Design a protein with these regions (language model features):
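Family-specific signature for flavin-dependent thymidylate synthase
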Residues: 1-235
Length: 235
């Protein structure tokens, strides 16, 4: 299985493999009674809704998605902080994941993020943006010059034989990186819930929205129920 959804100018999320389906959590829950369904029925939907509504989440950790994510380094830093935050909170129920990232010690970076516009700093929220910078052309020139200088210096260092592990340290956070991320349904929904909301950075919101679309495709019934119970009520 391989489906690629584009994000930003050069990024994407590629689904490599999926473990389980909409029946997986309800059958996992029924194991206590030795029951098992072969087709997803209205009865299964009611059980799945009950499990989600009453926060019986362990059955939803049997559904997994393996994906390749290509994103700017500043987006991936936020993403990994989310993953690590889950992992190190001992009483949090969503620790299940695997994360492996491409290494600049072995490969040369070539893709860099270029935004469509340049946002202004919010006056009310120190970590958010609001509206656009008045001088868009000037901002673009500064962005391009800073990025070009870093890239040219990086390439020259590689040409002169400098170790990649050292030369990469001057690259801007706009450099695109790649990771393999395998996570449970519950872990992914937790990420979407926290990152597809107005106070998150715009770029990571875009990845969260694409991820939501992917989940509606691979686990349609379970995702719709989760959205109905937790997200639609908040809107």
């Amino acid at each position: 299985m391989s489906n690629i959804d584009k994000v930003l100018d050069k990024g994407y999320i590629e689904v490599v493999d999926v473990l389980g389906d909409d029946l997986t959590p309800v059958n996992a829950a029924r194991v206590s009674f030795g029951g098992r369904s072969k087709e997803f029925t209205s009865k299964d939907r009611r059980l799945s809704k009950f499990l989600i509504k009453h926060k019986h989440f362990s059955p939803f950790r049997h559904q997994h998605v393996m994906m390749i994510i290509k994103a700017p380094e500043f987006v991936m830093r936020q993403w990994y902080k989310h993953v690590v935050g889950i992992e190190t909170t001992s009483d949090h129920p969503t620790k299940d994941h695997a994360w492996n990232e491409i290494s600049g010690r072995y490969v040369e970076y070539s893709d860099f993020y270029m935004p469509e516009n340049f946002r202004a700093q919010s006056e009310d929220n120190k970590q958010a943006s609001d509206g656009l910078v008045d001088n868009q052309e000037g901002a673009e020139d500064l962005w391009n010059n800073a990025q070009r200088n870093s890239i040219e210096a990086y390439e020259k260092m590689i040409e002169m034989g400098m170790a990649k592990e050292q030369a990469r340290s001057i690259l801007p956070l706009t450099v695109y990186t790649q990771v393999w991320w395998t996570a449970s349904f519950q872990s992914i929904m937790n990420f979407i819930e926290l990152r597809d909301e107005p106070t998150s950075q715009v770029e990571i919101q875009e990845y969260a929205r694409v991820l939501k679309k992917i989940m509606l495709n691979v686990f349609p019934e379970t995702t719709k129920l989760w959205q109905e119970i937790y997200w639609d009520e908040q809107e």
